[in-house]
């Protein structure tokens, strides 16, 4: 066949391709411009070829190609099987072992919490607190020398330094959280965690692919909701968006650290971990309900390629950590600053918009007294706590800054908090803070990603009701246990 068509082929390297092609299909003869005699010659060659091999020429050539592919695959597979195990493979034999994987994961998470909330994190927090306390005292001493009025002194020392400083005091521990998560991501362990979580996420109707957006929810709910765009299934994307707000974002961390440090100092790390687990449990419960109700369909299979373990790049780790801390600082420097000033002004202006030295006549007290009865069954039916929760809908950091401004006149912030809460009511307050609706920025992002105001409002109201029910259960069950224990001599 090659001899017959050689005069029609301009490039010698194409001769074999066209010769084999003519044995399979004569349509190539038209493109080559073969004569009738040449076509009959090719037909005779094909007939002789089929008689010798005992089958159709096209089928024979197809089988030959499959045999060649099989041979290549066997060679490649045999070569891969002989590849020596790397240290990544050896570590995965432990990190992904069916019996050891989850204890290792728990140990990694426990180590992270110990670093952030143990002696090192606590010492860094106390140093930051002392800095802002001294800054406020300095303003109170220095500003009168420049003839500044008491109004501006109070605003600067109690409003700004007391409000913004109460949030920035937790920056060291927030930075440690970001640092640990970045290291785990850089070294490749977070991808293994996503693989491990696939089994559990399927129990609530999701896949391991949702783990990364959900994990980002521990940093910022807004960015986590936007990260859900990467999910291929619309069902998985919507479910992930609805469950993410139940996970404790970094903005809630200052609330946890503040109150657990005051009321549960001996078990602060365990208390903070339990609040994170509470959010995870709530997300699982809601996800299970969604899977059996509104989103009763099967999720798509999850396929992923595990990256090799790498030594984290110091440059990347520091850049990511500083970038995330920068977002925290920008929020403290803008939104928290404005809220702190607003709350301080509300404490010193009455309902007639006139300056008042009597805090009981202020707008702050009026709003707090109106909201307080709603939270009385939860154990913290006081105006300061109610207004702090209301401010938390704007930004969760504002809960701490609101309490800081409200308690600015006290000798000690911690002492003022013990007058607002008991250990039991503080536990109830923390439960509510861990579960209630996210900030307005996250809600706006949810509305944009879900393309539905109705769904967003239902999600926010449902989350507030879940938080209220959980806090009510904590406080009322705690009261019952106290009564039972007090009945024993």
Model-derived features: where do they sit?
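Transmembrane helix-loop junctions at the membrane interface of multipass transporters and ion channels
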Residues: 250-273, 441-452, 473-483
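Core alpha-helical transmembrane segments of integral membrane proteins
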Residues: 95-195
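Extended, low-charge hydrophobic alpha-helical regions
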Residues: 52, 59-63, 122-159, 204, ...
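Alpha-helical transmembrane helix bundles of large polytopic membrane transport and channel proteins
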Residues: 1-81
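Juxtamembrane inter-helical linkers in multi-pass membrane proteins
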Residues: 130, 134-138, 193-221, 296-320, ...
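Conserved phosphate-handling catalytic cores of large alpha/beta enzymes
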Residues: 1-17, 215, 222-300, 404
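Short, membrane-interfacial amphipathic segments enriched in basic
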Residues: 58, 74-88, 132, 142-153, ...
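Hydrophobic core segments of alpha-helical transmembrane domains in multi-pass membrane transport
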Residues: 104-115, 177-182, 260-262, 276-290, ...
